[in-house]
Amino acid sequence: MPVLKLAAVFANRRDTQEETGEEHLTFNAIADPTDHLPFASLVLSASPKLIALNEQLCVGLYLVSERAMLNRPLDELSHGDLPASVGIFPVIAKPGLDASSADTHWREVHGPLALKVHSAMTHYYQLQIVHRSFGPAWHGLVLL
């Protein structure tokens, strides 16, 4: 069952627990420098406090629907069950392809193909963007 969450992407690495007093699922880039990346930090949360961070170098703020393609939903994983290393990639909007068609292709064609080809994956999550408050016009984010 899809779960709606806020997803914020930042130009710099974040410590959102310290910034908001709440625990969020935060993925920070390990590359140094990070200016060649589309973003350096992805923060997922159900808390509206995440919206307040949008003034602090936020690249984009999105409402996303999480689909767990491989493994349990992120909220169900203990800290020890989270992957030690995560690849995060934006799904760039293809000109002429609306969001609904792109999501159908991602869910029904690309997702199953990725699971078949990348047999060593332990986690695969599709974060479909259902609303963009601001930021790049992506169709989604993928966590591998």
Q: What do the predicted segments below correspond to?
A:
Residues 1-144:
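Macromolecular interaction modules
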